[in-house]
Amino acid sequence: MTKSELIEQLCSKKPQLSAKQVEDTVKEILEQMATTLEGGDRIEIRGFGSFSLHYREPRLGRNPKTGDKVELDGKFVPHFKPGKELRERVNYS
């Protein structure tokens, strides 16, 4: 599902809200989540899951074009851990 598909689906479920209101709300939620992760904080949505940052250690990589070894810096990557309710819903639906 894309962001625009999510907005369309929410609009059909909540016809009292304008498409612009739904779009602005979805964008604001995603922006707040990105800002929270950017600040190094964790996001927990009970029953759904949690978002956090995992650190990837610096490592030696390889350039696929040339085969040369390349030094890759350490970095933080977003990580999602599904909650119990979401896992059960996906596995038993």
UniProtKB/Swiss-Prot annotation:
Which Pfam families is this protein grouped with? Answer: Bac_DNA_binding
Q: Name one GO molecular function term.
A: structural constituent of chromatin
Question: Which CDD domains has this protein been placed in?
Answer: IHF_B (cd13836)
Q: What InterPro entries does the database record attribute to this sequence?
A: Hist_DNA-bd, Histone-like_DNA-bd_CS, IHF-like_DNA-bd_dom_sf, IHF_beta
Gene Ontology CC annotation, any one: cytosol
Domain of life of the native organism: Bacteria
The alphabetical list of record keywords is:
DNA recombination, DNA-binding, Transcription, Transcription regulation, Translation regulation
Gene Ontology biological process: DNA recombination; regulation of DNA-templated transcription; regulation of translation
Q: Which Gene3D superfamilies match?
A: IHF-like DNA-binding proteins
Q: Which NCBIfam families does the UniProt record give?
A: hip, PRK00199.1
Cross-referenced HAMAP family: IHF_beta (MF_00381)
Name the protein family.
Answer: Belongs to the bacterial histone-like protein family.
Assembly description: Heterodimer of an alpha and a beta chain.
Known function: This protein is one of the two subunits of integration host factor, a specific DNA-binding protein that functions in genetic recombination as well as in transcriptional and translational control.
| UniProt name for this protein | Integration host factor subunit beta
Give the species.
Answer: Aliivibrio fischeri (strain ATCC 700601 / ES114) (Vibrio fischeri)
Could you read off the lineage of the organism from its UniProt record? Bacteria, Pseudomonadati, Pseudomonadota, Gammaproteobacteria, Vibrionales
Name of encoding gene: ihfB
